[in-house]
Amino acid sequence: MRGSRIALVALAALGLAAAAPAGGTGAPDPPSVVLVTRDCASLDVVCPAYARAARRTGTRARIVSPDPREDITATFALLARQGHDLVIGDPALAPQLADAAAQNPQARFAVIDMPLALGSPRPPNVAIIEVRPRDAAYLAGWLAGRMERLRRGPDAVGAVGGYPIPPVDEFIVPFRAGALRATHGARVITGYSRSFTDPTACKVLAERQVAQGAGVLLDAAGGCGPGTLDVARRAGIWAVGVDRDRSGLGPHILTSVVKRYDRAFALLMRQARNDKLPAGRGMVVGLRQGGVELGRISPRVPGRVLRELAAVRRDVVAGRIKVPGAPPG
């Protein structure tokens, strides 16, 4: 793994050094798990969640961030030969992980937060876990539409995505469906900035949606998204964030579609400990499994709306409401 930099600074900052219990107690050795990711700075939700899961499950955990110039497949293969109970990769590294898995059939691998449809076919020693936001995104859309009904004027909500790809549309498609259900036919304005990194691209698109009457904006564009959220703040309208709880940004945040990566990682770590990893198969963790949820809801939302939202949530969890997802990409 020459050239790989094990993210020691990140390990210390995330508290991973204390994740594993001390040996010599007679207890079984804790499982050893390693996460291979491009950069914890760009995955600043995933890496802290990994650390929390390691502490919660008593797992010996490492993070490896390979140099982009090196052979990533070789990095995965070397980690597999080192005897880790589980080697996890982020979706961007899935092709290299699959190659290494085919070369090391005795090792166990997993890809975190990858749509199952994109991970087939897969080697028999690779598990895919999809943190599926669609049910929580539907609830966020319903809440957006319901609050829009309280605003004077025509009902309209907007959604700014990065690219028209399944991981983005898993937010936008159910958000749209929820808004339509709450408003019985609001105008839903969607668009794609064609960027995950340029806030200006999202700002331009969000301003266009506000000019078309949108009273709520969904941000589903990664690092481009702050442009959308700032437009909502300046326009005095609601915004809905994704991935993490964005309520700390200000009173314009209606709610957020929060991915609980810590619970997904904890599930994988426990399965590795108990030798029950669903290798060769995929798992979905969504609203019902606690893998996603709505973040803090604005205190300005009326109590009657919260009660209605709770009823919709029960219907979604029970399967009485069929929530659409992204079309196959």
Regions found by a protein language model. Give the residues of each.
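A residue-level marker of the well-folded mature domains of exported/periplasmic proteins
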Residues: G23-G329
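Bacterial N-terminal signal peptides
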Residues: A7-A17
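N-terminal Sec signal peptide cleavage junction
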Residues: A19-P21
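Positively charged n-region of N-terminal signal peptides that target proteins for export
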Residues: M1-R5
